[in-house]
């Protein structure tokens, strides 16, 4: 779902087969009334047609708003139809150019999705100073941080969040450079009456992951979406909630949507009622064995989770999975709203 203007959104979806071949099963783009999550009543921009499973091509029906039958555009199934229509869509009318604008907007938003999976072992080495675009595994974190710290406000934000993690107080961040213009970052930690500089080679996995996560949210373009795999991995349980809170504040400030994944029951048990509105559960469905997402609040009788002790406990004893796969008759839990 992408904001178009004050009245309308763009609703894009794609269904991909991963059985014998990886290719497009279904794909569509609609213009819908702002806030609606259903396609009924929406304006079709394009939608693929059903094809035989063996065909390597797929037809996309394009709504040109002309009298008669909508034209079909032939596309390959091995890549996104959306990306192909960028060059295959006709450019003869205002309607054509309007729809191309919608497609460009969706593609632009998809490009702003940044998946972060920091690998601490790859972050403990010198890198080229000019390598300042953060990579998925964060191997070039030292160059990214050096560039980031040229902005005093961003450096201040970074140190404020990172200082909450280790036992020793972090006073500053520094950089060691070579004659060949390679760089490695270091943290200055304060002890009782002294301080010491520790380069990335000596820092813990948790500290490196935290620094990478904060650096990402401070450097990616505003309006982006940041996906962080296993947010709590390597970070002490007592610090994770503080990190998530700080990330949430930073994300709101920079208009960045943050998607976190976790399997940590302790972290999930600590989620408050308002936070659960943003939680989705990923599970494997029985028929095809594929993974599906469902918003937590869309699970029938989800308040039972709180009766049992919390979201984390429900995940451990599989009662959460049972609520999804074997929903019982909906019960009245309005009495819980007072808690």
Predicted regions: what they are:
Residues 16-20, 177, 283-286:
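Short, low-complexity Ser/Thr-rich regulatory SLiMs
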Residues 140, 163, 167, 171-218, ...:
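Conserved ABC ATPase signature
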Residues 242-339:
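C-terminal lobe/lid and adjacent interdomain/linker elements of RecA-like ASCE P-loop ATPase modules
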């Amino acid at each position: 779902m992408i904001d178009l203007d004050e009245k309308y959104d763009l609703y894009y979806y794609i269904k991909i087969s991963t059985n014998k071949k990886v290719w497009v099963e279904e794909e569509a783009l609609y213009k819908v009334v702002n806030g609606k999550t259903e396609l009924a009543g929406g304006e079709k921009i394009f939608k693929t047609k059903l094809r035989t499973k063996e065909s390597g091509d797929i037809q996309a029906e394009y709504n040109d708003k002309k009298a008669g039958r909508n034209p079909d555009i032939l596309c390959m199934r091995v890549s996104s139809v959306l990306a192909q229509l960028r060059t295959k869509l006709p450019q003869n009318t205002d309607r054509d150019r309007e729809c191309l604008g919608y497609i460009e907007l969706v593609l632009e938003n998809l490009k702003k999705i940044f998946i972060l999976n920091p690998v601490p072992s790859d972050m403990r080495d010198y890198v080229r100073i000019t390598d300042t675009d953060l990579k998925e595994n964060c191997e070039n974190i030292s160059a990214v941080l050096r560039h980031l710290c040229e902005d005093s406000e961003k450096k201040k934000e970074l140190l404020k969040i990172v200082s909450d993690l280790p036992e020793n107080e972090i006073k500053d961040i520094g950089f060691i450079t070579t004659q060949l213009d390679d760089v490695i970052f270091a943290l200055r930690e304060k002890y009782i009456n002294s301080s010491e500089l520790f380069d990335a080679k000596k820092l813990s996995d948790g500290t490196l992951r935290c620094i990478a996560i904060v650096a990402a949210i401070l450097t990616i373009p505003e309006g982006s979406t940041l996906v962080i795999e296993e947010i709590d991995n390597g970070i002490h349980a007592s610090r994770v909630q503080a990190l998530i809170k700080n990330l949430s504040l930073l994300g709101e400030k920079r208009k960045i949507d943050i998607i976190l994944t976790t399997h940590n029951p302790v972290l999930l048990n600590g989620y408050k009622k308002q936070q659960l509105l943003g939680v989705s559960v990923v599970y494997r469905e029985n028929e095809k064995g594929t993974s599906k997402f469902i918003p937590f609040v869309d699970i029938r009788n989800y308040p039972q989770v709180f009766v049992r002790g919390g979201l984390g406990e429900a995940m451990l004893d599989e009662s959460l999975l049972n609520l999804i796969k074997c929903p019982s008759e909906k019960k009245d839990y309005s009495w819980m709203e007072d808690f």
